[in-house]
């Protein structure tokens, strides 16, 4: 489970603090809005993995861990990503 915990305010052990670096406690690169946005905009087809650290599986995993706020979980990666745009729109409507 640790592999899917990124710098979103909580780490794999449940600490309520932001990571001090762009990496999570496992040393994996966290979701980055600039990186993700760039990759998403370059994607030829909707539904492709957002990046090597941001696949559909990881998005589902993060949603299950933090079901209350999908936009917070996915940080800045949602707005320009076809794969997750519908989920984000639904969440915003229900705010």
From Swiss-Prot:
Q: Which domain of life is it from?
A: Eukaryota
Q: Where in the cell is it found?
A: Secreted
Q: Give yes or no: UniProt keyword Transit peptide.
A: no
Gene Ontology cellular-component annotations: extracellular region
Tissue pattern of expression reads: Expressed by the liver.
Signal peptide location: none
Which UniProt keywords are given for this protein, alphabetically ordered? Disulfide bond, Phospholipase A2 inhibitor, Secreted
Disulphide bridges, residue numbers: 2-26, 5-12, 19-30, 61-77
According to its UniProt record, where is this protein mainly located? secreted
Self-association state and partner proteins as the record states? Forms dimers or higher order oligomers in a temperature-dependent manner in vitro.
Q: What is this protein called?
A: Phospholipase A2 inhibitor gammaCdcPLI
Organism this protein belongs to: Crotalus durissus collilineatus (Brazilian rattlesnake)
Print the organism lineage.
Answer: Eukaryota, Metazoa, Chordata, Craniata, Vertebrata
């Amino acid at each position: 489970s640790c592999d899917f915990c990124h710098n979103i305010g909580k780490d794999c052990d449940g600490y309520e603090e932001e990571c001090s670096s762009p990496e999570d406690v496992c040393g994996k690169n966290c979701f980055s809005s600039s990186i993700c946005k760039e990759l998403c905009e370059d994607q030829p087809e909707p539904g492709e993995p957002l990046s090597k650290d941001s696949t559909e599986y990881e998005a589902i995993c993060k949603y299950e861990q933090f079901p209350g706020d999908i936009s917070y979980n996915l940080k800045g990666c949602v707005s320009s990503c076809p794969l997750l745009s519908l989920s984000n729109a639904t969440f915003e409507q229900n705010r």
